A protein has these predicted regions:
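Flexible, surface-exposed loop/gating regions in the mature catalytic domains
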Residues: 1
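Metal-dependent phosphoesterase core characteristic of DEDDh/y 3'-5' exonuclease domains
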Residues: 5-140
Length: 141
């Protein structure tokens, strides 16, 4: 994989929740000479606190498993960005990569700052960080 990345001059490695992928992969050296973008962190930084996203999630029941906060899944972000409340994630490698790319491109088009080279979990647990930063209550206060 590394030689293919070198051949095609890959500068960035991206995934939705890179922390999970990083822990599960045997190809950790991919990040040695490349930057990485956690699309999960990127989408949270750009969309999770927007009133339009929060309202969309509350109205359409996109909630966390505990039902205490709004969802921040690839499925909920994609449904919001495409305004498709019928969307159901297929959970195949190809389809997941397609929606992750769509989320990434939408984030880029927003022209907002985002963090590179940090996994969502590490960002939320950094010094001075707030692990609940993107935990928006499911019910409006």
């Amino acid at each position: 994989i590394n030689s293919l990345c070198n051949y095609y001059n890959v500068r960035y490695v991206m995934a939705f929740n890179t922390g999970f992928d990083y822990c599960k992969t045997k190809c950790r050296d991919l990040l040695k000479d490349r930057e990485f973008i956690d699309i999960f962190l990127m989408a949270c930084q750009i969309y999770a606190k927007r009133k339009s996203y929060i309202d969309f999630c509350r109205k359409n029941n996109y909630l966390s498993k505990s039902k205490k906060s709004i969802a921040t899944s690839a499925e909920s972000f994609y449904a919001f960005l495409t305004n498709n409340t019928e969307y159901a994630e297929e959970h195949t490698a190809l389809e997941d990569s397609k929606i992750e790319m769509a989320i990434f491109l939408a984030c880029l088009k927003a022209h907002k700052p985002f963090t590179k080279n940090q996994h969502y979990f590490d960002y939320c647990n950094r010094e001075g960080g707030n692990r609940w930063e993107f935990s928006i209550p499911a019910i409006a206060k």
